[in-house]
């Protein structure tokens, strides 16, 4: 795999079959992007989809958002690392112990897999948080969980671009920010409530940009990826 890749773009293989995902991968250059495998794709096709993408020289972000008791979370993260995953995530709300143990399990087994946490899903807003019993607002919850993630020595968090500036100031420049909800100006917002353009997200402090439909549903995905990279 191309460990020297310098692109911030992670293409999300969401709502796609294995055949469609591999057909898309065959149109893209692994030197220009990484690929994200989420719950649906992984549940349907398992490790084989990851292996097939690795065979095409892509680095893979396994977006399974593990959320369980500490040992189960740590073992799941370790299993992902053993697949050769570039990056994997957990829910910060699983707690400090789960995150810390997962990171330590990677270190104990000499894996350099990036481990990041999800604070608040980008589909959620203040009203959605109130429905779950969190009443002090989106910003407070994101900041609280990001700080907990840093304390657990994880590599970064998933966050919206609107949260990036504050989180860089709060957690430091080395704390990686992975931003979904990236759209071009003429794209539909779909189910993301906190969205941003690629260039603005980087300006705001995001390190990696998760881009799905803008590329996967394009007539020419490779050309669309090039257009996005040129816009940066």
Curated annotation (Swiss-Prot):
Pathways involved: Pyrimidine metabolism; UMP biosynthesis via de novo pathway; UMP from orotate: step 2/2
UniProt name for this protein = Orotidine 5'-phosphate decarboxylase
Its EC number is 4.1.1.23
Q: What does this protein do?
A: Catalyzes the decarboxylation of orotidine 5'-monophosphate (OMP) to uridine 5'-monophosphate (UMP).
Source organism of this protein record:
Psychrobacter cryohalolentis (strain ATCC BAA-1226 / DSM 17306 / VKM B-2378 / K5)
Q: Name one molecular function that GO assigns to this entry.
A: orotidine-5'-phosphate decarboxylase activity
For this protein, the record's Pfam families field holds: OMPdecase (PF00215)
Transmembrane residues, as ranges?
none
Q: What is the lineage of its organism?
A: Bacteria, Pseudomonadati, Pseudomonadota, Gammaproteobacteria, Moraxellales
Q: Which residues bind substrate?
A: 14, 36, 63-72, 122, 183, 192, 212-213
């Amino acid at each position: 795999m191309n460990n020297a890749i310098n692109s911030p773009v992670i293409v999300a293989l969401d709502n796609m079959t294995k055949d469609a995902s591999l057909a898309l991968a065959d149109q893209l250059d692994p030197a220009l992007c990484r690929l994200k495998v989420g719950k649906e794709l992984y549940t349907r096709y398992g490790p084989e989809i990851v292996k097939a993408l690795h065979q095409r020289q892509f680095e893979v972000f396994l977006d399974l958002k593990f959320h369980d008791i500490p040992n189960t979370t740590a073992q799941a993260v370790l299993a992902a690392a053993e697949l050769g995953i570039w990056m994997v995530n957990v829910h910060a709300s699983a707690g400090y112990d789960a995150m810390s143990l997962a990171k330590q399990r990677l270190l104990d087994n000499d894996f350099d897999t990036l481990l990041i946490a999800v604070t608040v899903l980008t589909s959620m807003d203040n009203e959605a948080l109130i429905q779950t019993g969190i009443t002090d607002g989106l910003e407070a919850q994101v900041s609280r969980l990001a700080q907990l993630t840093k304390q657990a020595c994880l590599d970064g968090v998933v966050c919206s671009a609107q949260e990036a500036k504050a989180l860089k100031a709060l957690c430091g420049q080395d704390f990686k920010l992975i931003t979904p909800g990236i759209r071009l100006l003429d794209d539909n917002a779909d189910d993301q409530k906190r969205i941003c353009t690629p260039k603005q997200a980087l300006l705001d402090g995001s390190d990696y940009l998760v881009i799905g439909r803008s590329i996967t549903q394009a007539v020419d995905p490779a050309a669309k990826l090039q257009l996005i990279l040129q816009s940066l």
